[in-house]
């Protein structure tokens, strides 16, 4: 998604010229493609088609009519809908070899300008002029366009694999192998190098994963040049323009100042390279705040070989060159430096990626495989939940039935055993109590009767008081008997 971060007046101020008659002031600034912004900004200009024909003289672009494009896309059928970007909806079509002489039969992608979208007539013209004159294996091929009344359409070669974004982040897609990822990074850098080193350098300004398209062989090609700008000319170090781009990819100095340079594209390339390494989006609001922005989360670990494994895409399943991964991480770190002057230029990036791509010595031996469900994830999830819930309900009912049955059986058995035991205990207790009662009664009667046979004298002797003992002692002394007390004193009486 393209976002306009800011639009300060002091950043974008085209030259103003007055007409001789002083009737009105018009803004006029030469574009990198030869047409004036006055012409580009006026979609109802009657000379627009003529201007395009003159500017694109010698190019092989075809000018289609609205009727022809309806035939190609089957009236823009919903079954041919491919997606939608900042420019507008994109439909798949097929050009028959009978449609026009010299135009071979081929599948195409038709992009329709949404007049209420984020991009408009200016971006349409920039796209046509740029891709109409620039040809490179790593730039998507523009076959033709339609500029009829208010209709603005672009016809491209069809890219069967879609965008890098869909290949990396779509849930049902197969993971890209390590070598394929390096090739994509290398080819995308080659396309960017072609723009930066052109006779009139061009700054891409919107380098991101969704703008890198892949053909059937996974060859990477840059697309969507609507935001492209002329590079600085002469002694100029940058281009001042309103800030437009995609959140998570735009260079920090460009966001803050509106100063655009080729190093701004290098920063954006570093973000895409980081996405290839980690398998994560540049901005993912589903993650925690610390991990939401990819650059802020991963940059501290790019220069640490011990921590590099933490950020590598787990879907690679360790099927990658550790040496190559370290070099690629170092390159991404250099591209993401805060100061533009310290970032490498794109030619250096291409050279480093060439070396990394050719280095395959320590890639683990084996075929890269990744098992995915045959059904779409949503269907698999729903089926799994249904299957999971069905046994769960059956198990629950069966368990309740078995539990209730067992509970009744246990309850009946327990009551029977309890009642039986209770009766046995009661009978045994009564028998033991009666037996013990009789024994206690008999023993008590015997013991009660026995002490009554003891003599009274013995009892008196056994249980006499001190006064009684002293009286008996006096009687004994008087009668002349030896006294125990006297004996204790050591004497006898004769």
From Swiss-Prot:
The active site is at residue 206. SUPFAM superfamilies: Protein kinase-like (PK-like). InterPro entries: Kinase-like_dom_sf (IPR011009), Plant_Ser_Thr_Prot_Kinase (IPR050823), Prot_kinase_dom (IPR000719), Ser-Thr/Tyr_kinase_cat_dom (IPR001245), Ser/Thr_kinase_AS (IPR008271). One of its GO terms (cellular component) is plasma membrane. Residues 443-458 have a biased composition (Polar residues). PANTHER family: OS01G0588500 PROTEIN-RELATED. This is Serine/threonine-protein kinase PBL13. It comes from Arabidopsis thaliana. The gene is PBL13.
